[in-house]
């Protein structure tokens, strides 16, 4: 297994807003350089350019719409976030759910603009369906565990291992991330042992009093 991929989602936490978005990204970059582990961040949309301009690491959008240029007031246009410095995007996070048609349209737009795409799912069947669309990653996150502090890798390990198995049968090129309740080194280790290639996490790092120390704890068993 290669080095895991870690994506830190800032959500709309005040600690990850504005200057805080840059400060946390700098902590991620430092830990990434020291460990050799790829760590990316997903700040709020208005902070994408700020973070991408000030810190050399992969920046993801928390959402994008499957639309093109034109009369789409309030939508998130893939070309715009790409030119702001985004490297990729989340699609269908449980806090920003989409219909199947919208997921497919967003993924198509992400590919059109050269953005790495992560489709979020909540169980094995939806993970299998997402894998059939061929994103770069699927991220399995049971919504009831998000922000709970209870890692999915312990609360429901079968949903992780089952997702990994389902994806490998449909398209082994699609990588699987594990999310929900991930915050400590044991959580990441368990997620990797279940076959995932990395994790999607948020509050355990963003809201920590010392995000750098929290990241160092997260990767200590890798």
Curated annotation (Swiss-Prot):
Keywords (A to Z) from UniProt: Cytoplasm, Gluconeogenesis, Glycolysis, Isomerase
Nucleotide-binding listed as a keyword: no
E.C. numbers: 5.3.1.1
Subcellular location: Cytoplasm
GO molecular function term, any single one: triose-phosphate isomerase activity
Listed pathway(s): Carbohydrate biosynthesis; gluconeogenesis; Carbohydrate degradation; glycolysis; D-glyceraldehyde 3-phosphate from glycerone phosphate: step 1/1
Binding site for substrate: 9-11, 146, 181, 202-203
Catalytic reaction annotation: D-glyceraldehyde 3-phosphate = dihydroxyacetone phosphate
GO process annotations (BP): gluconeogenesis; glycolytic process
Catalytic residues in the record: 93, 141
SUPFAM superfamilies from the UniProt entry: Triosephosphate isomerase (TIM)
Xref: CDD domains: TIM (cd00311)
Disulfide-bonded cysteines: none
GO cellular component: cytoplasm
Entry similarity comment: Belongs to the triosephosphate isomerase family.
Subunit comment: Homotetramer; dimer of dimers.
Function: Involved in the gluconeogenesis. Catalyzes stereospecifically the conversion of dihydroxyacetone phosphate (DHAP) to D-glyceraldehyde-3-phosphate (G3P).
Protein name, per record: Triosephosphate isomerase
Organism of derivation: Methanosarcina mazei (strain ATCC BAA-159 / DSM 3647 / Goe1 / Go1 / JCM 11833 / OCM 88)
